[in-house]
């Protein structure tokens, strides 16, 4: 699918959404994003630490230092409530094999890697001490409220939640200034609908993503970046 040849306006059925997207595009041209403003670099780099710390805060800090030394401008983690993120009937399914061959359920992985509120506060403070701002991907409203109350103004929505319109609606009203949305597995209609939910005063950053690891070269489609 060559997105460069498909006018966004024709893909949207809702005229209000179309008008909103056009207006948002006009207002954002030639403006630096919050990430540019904070990092003061032309291309901000975000270290996707996610849950790779395995719940070990000391390891998370070491990964932050490595990210800083590698030239990254931000570090991003995941913050979630496990009972909300995974359904009860899936807790023992989706086995994950660790490096030593041990099999863990998705429930085990999420529980082991889950950050507590005090962990998030510690990582934010540590990021300030090494000049590496921290922000989080959230998967539920409770987590979003918690990190907003920590003073966080930037939040990220994962690809799996791009079409979670209830989450977008709640993020719109919580008080964040910048919403970053990943778009892996979503089509342009879903992306457009997500954007249309947000008020004009919010900064929305759309990320071109591929939810396959590693991504084959024929699926990369870097031309999508300028389209989005």
Map each language-model feature to its residues:
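Catalytic cores and adjacent flexible loops of soluble metabolic enzymes
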Residues: 2-228
